[in-house]
């Protein structure tokens, strides 16, 4: 949006125009050379005249923005490069999300942490540029924001556990699982919240669903963290009081790493690799 004007997918139409605009917005801190933009848009595809193709694409983008938004010069040309006009302020939801997470992480005030992480989680609507994940720069940003989202969710869930806000854990985990259905810990949080809410039948159903999801998507059999949750379900079935949620969560961490080689097909390997990238990004590796 710009003032009262909206530039949506219908007006842009071309995927390449959308990618060009998003690249200019997300990299607006510096001028982008023709080579940088060409590599970002076409990667290793052979383009006869990348400078000419980029010039044509930029012309189309400027024409659309001028027609539907404003005569302002959003993108300027300088010495063989293109740059976003810094006089035009930009606010991206992704960057607002990042700011919330950073404020929460930097604070020691529980109320501030809760408020900012809750705002961040509410703002996150899914993978960043999910239709452009065939481009390395989009994948990098998407992985970065998604890892930040998972960290926000799990930190928030741990705070809710300490505050005994089990219904909030249930709502939070349901929302998070819509964004990432193959994260085992998210399934554990959800099932543990159902256990504390004495929703045994639903918890058992969700356990079975979670095991099947992880098996189908990743080829993982008998996931260790979910097995600990299953023990609590069995206790409930026998009429035994469930263990404290804090203890269940602590025990989800495996004592020993699995040893040996794991064989899987390429689709499973690709998904595991993607998850490892997310994990390493969270850990700053």
Give the ranges of each region predicted by the language model:
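Amphipathic HAMP/coiled-coil signal-transducing linker helices
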Residues: 245-266
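An N-terminal, helix-rich hydrophobic module
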Residues: 105-128, 144-240
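Active-site-flanking beta-strand signature of metal-NTP-handling nucleotidyl enzymes
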Residues: 97, 250-251, 284-285
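Short regulatory alpha-helical coupling segments
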Residues: 264-284
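Intrinsically disordered, low-complexity protein-interaction/activation regions
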Residues: 1-171
